[in-house]
Amino acid sequence: MVAAVRAPVKPEMVELSPAAMERYSSDADTTAPNSSLSSAASSTGSLARCSSLSRLSFDCSPSAAVAAAATSCSPPRASVLLRPHRSGDVAWAAIRAASTTSAAPLGPRDFKLVRRIGGGDIGTVYLCRLRSSPERESPCMYAMKVVDRRAVARKQKLGRAAAEKRILRQLDHPFLPTLFADFDATPHFSCAVMEFCPGGDLHSLRHRMPSRRFPLPSARFYAAEVLLAIEYLHMMGIVYRDLKPENVLIRADGHIMLTDFDLSLQSTTSPSLDGDTDTDDEASGGASCFPDHLLRFKRRRNAVAAPRPRFVAEPVDARSCSFVGTHEYVAPEVASGGAHGAAVDWWAYGVFLYELIYGRTPFAGATNEATLRNIVRRPLAFPSGSGSCGPADADARDLIARLLAKDPAARLGSRRGAADVKSHPFFKSLNLALLRSSRPPVVPGAGAGAAPLHRSQSCKAAPTTPPPPTTTKPANATARFDLF
């Protein structure tokens, strides 16, 4: 993964031509799936094999740029003010300044591509910066996802690409991507500008841990942030359907960002407040043998100790028969070919937590077919001698076991969603409301004892040390499938 932003060599910038587009299209078709916005594909060897900057450039004439901006699907300039949790971010302020000084919505003329940093099933990701920010002033860096509509159309995945951009426009959460701008570079290329995450992804970070697994406090921290992101998505009626460590990126401040929404399912939700009710005789007006003054004291004590109402928001009519996901993380109802709903995210969350703690997924087989059989038939088992048997470890195993119930109706989270998961004793030591202000286990670029970076410091000049080598899973372990 790219842990640092090095000063790029000035590439040769060329115009987009039909021949160049065709070469880029063929290159996009062969891009390995499941790469993140800060993928290891940005290593020197990968760049040598695919010099994408020789094929894709935004150095167009002013008239062409204005024409492209006029046909852009970028939101109007006023929409850049609708991100309250990013109000103090330097990267967002730079976007806002560029938008207000431009006569047209942000478009291809406003960005300069630096290098290719990754690729996915429906697009290629580039490191980029605003042209209005001089290089000598350490400009803010962004990740631009470029989708070749012709290549995606050949794969019959145009609907997925459109759904992902539609979801990105709705999101406003500290642990989810911010869509800074979206526009068309040419009639065939659609671009989305998002935050660049210099810390890589959780899969690569796990492989740098001792024994290739996270200590329990670190796993709890990352799982809690992912939990809050899923809670927000479900509140918006979005079933994620692609949770795995490769899709959890590390921001400059060490907090996470969930990414890749092309497999997500949109539905409706009905938020409500759910709380336990008192069923004592005295609460219901029944007779009691206690004196009145003792009853008044008991009622006051119960009122103080009574649990607060919990916010519940789960997609209410999200049902799909699509066979989508990554083999090791799909729920039994998906593996068996049945219909599924929001409960698939809680199954994947259990697999995700299992992998963070134990260094592997619980049902992996020698082949993808064996993995799917294990998911449907094999009971959950925990590795022996994998750690302590203290209360914290017992809580982790209990939470995982409840999340990995093969019956979706019995699965933790299937009834009250994240409210049930958040109340589990595993998260008792965390203040989830203040999680964003907590120091993450790993802060990119910060040494021992260093103060945590603020998210806006992704705009600072990064050290020029090369990124550490990463270990990736076998191709069949992370390959996604989508049979409709």
Swiss-Prot record:
Q: Which GO terms describe its biological process?
A: auxin-activated signaling pathway; flower development; regulation of auxin polar transport; root development; shoot system development
Instruction: State the GO CC annotations.
Output: cytoplasm; nucleus; plasma membrane
Keywords annotated in UniProt = ATP-binding, Auxin signaling pathway, Developmental protein, Kinase, Nucleotide-binding, Serine/threonine-protein kinase, Transferase
Keyword rRNA-binding on entry: no
Q: Which reactions fall under this protein's catalytic activity?
A: L-seryl-[protein] + ATP = O-phospho-L-seryl-[protein] + ADP + H(+); L-threonyl-[protein] + ATP = O-phospho-L-threonyl-[protein] + ADP + H(+)
Region: Disordered, residue numbers: 445-484
Give the family from UniProt: Belongs to the protein kinase superfamily. Ser/Thr protein kinase family.
Binding of ATP, residues: I117, G118, G119, G120, D121, I122, G123, T124, V125, K145
Bias class Low complexity marks the residues at 472-484
The UniProt record lists the EC number as 2.7.11.1
Induction or repression: By auxin.
Q: Where is the Protein kinase domain?
A: 111-427
State the function annotated in the UniProt record.
Answer: Serine/threonine-protein kinase involved in the regulation of auxin signaling. May control polar auxin transport and probably plays a role in the pattern formation and organogenesis in the rice shoot.
| Any one Pfam family match given in the protein's UniProt record, by short name | Pkinase
State the tissue distribution. Answer: Expressed in the shoot apical meristem at the boundary of the new forming meristems. Expressed in the regions where panicle branches are produced, in developing flower and vascular bundles.
Q: Which InterPro entries match?
A: Kinase-like_dom_sf (IPR011009), Prot_kinase_dom (IPR000719), Ser/Thr_kinase_AS (IPR008271)
The species is Oryza sativa subsp. japonica
The molecular function terms of the Gene Ontology recorded here are: ATP binding; protein serine kinase activity; protein serine/threonine kinase activity
| Domain AGC-kinase C-terminal stretches | 428-484
Q: Which residues form the active site?
A: D242
Q: Please state what the protein is called.
A: Protein kinase PINOID
Q: What else is known?
A: Plants overexpressing PID show variety of development abnormalities, such as delay of adventitious root development, curled growth of shoots and agravitropism.
